[in-house]
């Protein structure tokens, strides 16, 4: 998909507006854009795929630079919470997008941080090593039992591994921890329909009716 310069300008404007509203510096955005600055000089077959589909112009870098010069939040540092969330998001992307060999190079088993175990759990699951995936995710749940996304991921491992009844408690708990999340409602409803039985199907219908109310 090709993105026009107009689309990229609109995206940049939306990005800095969102950052400003949350009192976050745009220095990270500028650093990201500069990583691709030299890509324009390369032949198309040597360019990063992102650069080929997302035009990078001097104007984009100048726009973000000007914003940084005028924003009162440009010297703000990322909070510990934001850094932790970023590390976890990066681990999730690596887990779902990279080969397991690359995952284990980036997050070796000696690394027992939450992002590392998260990435390995997803990587093992993609390799159909459900027992290793469950070992990693169960360890995370033992430490952070109130995290709905860990329970959701555990449910996904079991559901897609054909263990529908075993998956249900994990999805049910994820929904209880995050009751207004319509995506979780849909996932739970799908599982309940797959399992079958009047009670679960009726429950699934109720959940889907709530989804329609939230997102008509």
Where do the PLM segments sit?
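Glycine- and small hydrophobic-rich membrane-insertion segments that are intrinsically disordered
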Residues: 1-2, 198
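Short, intrinsically disordered, charge-balanced linker/junction segments flanking boundaries
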Residues: 209-216
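Extracytoplasmic and endomembrane cell-envelope/extracellular-matrix remodeling and assembly machinery
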Residues: 2-183, 191, 206-207
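Short, structured loop/turn "capping" segments at alpha-beta junctions
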Residues: 184, 199-200
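Short coil/turn and helix-start
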Residues: 127, 197-199
């Amino acid at each position: 998909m090709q993105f026009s310069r107009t689309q990229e300008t609109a995206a940049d404007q939306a990005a800095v507006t969102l950052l400003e509203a949350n009192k976050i510096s745009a220095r990270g955005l500028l650093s990201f854009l500069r990583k691709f600055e030299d890509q324009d000089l390369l032949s198309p077959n040597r360019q990063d795929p992102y650069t080929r589909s997302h035009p990078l112009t001097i104007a984009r870098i100048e726009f973000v630079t000007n914003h940084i010069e005028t924003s009162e939040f440009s010297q703000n540092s990322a909070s510990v919470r934001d850094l932790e969330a970023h590390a976890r998001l990066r681990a999730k992307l690596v887990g779902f997008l990279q080969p397991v060999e690359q995952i284990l190079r980036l997050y070796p088993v000696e690394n027992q941080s939450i992002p590392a175990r998260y990435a390995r759990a997803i990587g093992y699951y993609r390799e159909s090593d459900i027992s290793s995936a469950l070992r990693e995710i169960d360890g995370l749940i033992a430490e952070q039992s109130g995290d709905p996304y860990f329970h959701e991921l555990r449910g996904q491992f079991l559901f897609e591994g054909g263990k529908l009844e075993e998956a249900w408690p994990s999805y049910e708990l994820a929904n209880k921890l995050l009751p207004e999340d319509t995506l979780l409602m849909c996932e739970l409803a799908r599982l309940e329909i797959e399992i079958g039985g009047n009670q679960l199907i009726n429950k699934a219908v109720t959940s889907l009716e709530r989804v329609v109310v939230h997102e008509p």
